[in-house]
């Protein structure tokens, strides 16, 4: 393990070299870098190997994006996705042919200003998470920021990334805090905890590149999907890459706490009720007759 960490630490200097080279790019050129990486990943036959090779460049891209957001508004030529975002979220504004990404936005009802840039220890944490290691970070060391690195990288495959937190508040908070960073580079992001089980928007959330939610939310959706009698009722489609917050609590402390689906499915059974009502009434009439 120590040997592996030393290898990963050497990647940090490479990431920072690329990061500094990006400082001279315009905002549009920075976005174009992201587009070119996505094309490379999409055209690859071995996406895992391609992601591993692209890691330094992608982490530098995310770090530079975070730096620019920390300095103020980020202005780029508007595309169709920018226009759609501006009509649905407050962190993007369209003026003429320009999209203005603000560094201040509403994070679930709380005003928030982006002021975070990844430091070396956070880069190391992001590398370890991508390669499947469990890492321990104290409160305040920036777990939310660390997660942006492997989440962004693995979202480039468009096969889905699930980010699981321990409660509803954290999943919504992290979704709101980091959404603009991902959206700036064209990635789609949603949070399942904002919608009920049979809301079509919950199904859309699973189709996004990045999906936030609680571990219980993901588990129960998985269980309900396996109880569904119609494939159209299923919401989860892909199980590609996941990051689990509070891993020790979820996989060790609460490992013996079962997730149980009890009772009927939550579908509209009014038609079934009406169909059998006449038969029930007829039966009651027969019973009451002498």
What are these regions (language model features)?
Residues 1-284, 288:
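Conserved P-loop NTPase motor core
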């Amino acid at each position: 393990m120590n040997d592996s960490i030393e290898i990963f630490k050497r990647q940090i200097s490479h990431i920072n070299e690329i990061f500094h080279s990006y400082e001279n790019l315009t905002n549009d050129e920075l976005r174009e870098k992201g587009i070119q990486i996505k094309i490379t990943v999409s055209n690859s036959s071995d996406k895992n190997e391609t992601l591993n090779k692209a890691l330094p460049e992608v982490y530098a891209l995310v770090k530079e994006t975070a730096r620019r957001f920390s300095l103020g508004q980020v202005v780029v030529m508007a595309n169709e996705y920018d226009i759609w975002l501006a009509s649905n979220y407050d962190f993007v504004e369209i003026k003429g042919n320009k999209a203005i990404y603000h560094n201040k936005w509403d994070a679930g009802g709380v005003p928030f200003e982006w002021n975070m840039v990844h430091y070396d220890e956070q880069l190391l944490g992001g590398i370890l998470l991508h390669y499947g290691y469990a890492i321990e970070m104290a409160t305040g060391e920036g777990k939310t920021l660390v997660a942006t690195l492997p989440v962004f990288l693995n979202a480039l495959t468009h096969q889905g990334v699930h980010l699981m937190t321990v409660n509803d508040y954290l999943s919504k908070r992290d979704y709101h805090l980091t959404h603009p960073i991902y959206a700036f580079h064209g990635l789609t992001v949603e949070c399942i905890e904002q919608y009920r089980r049979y809301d079509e928007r919950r199904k859309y959330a699973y189709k996004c590149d990045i999906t936030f939610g609680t571990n219980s939310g993901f588990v129960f959706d998985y269980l309900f999907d396996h109880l569904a009698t119609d494939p159209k009722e299923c919401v989860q489609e892909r199980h590609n890459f996941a990051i689990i917050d509070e891993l020790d609590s979820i996989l060790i402390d609460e490992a013996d706490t079962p997730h149980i689906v009890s009772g009927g499915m939550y579908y509209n059974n009014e038609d079934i009720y009406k169909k059998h009502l006449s038969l029930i009434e007829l039966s009651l009439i027969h019973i009451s007759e002498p």
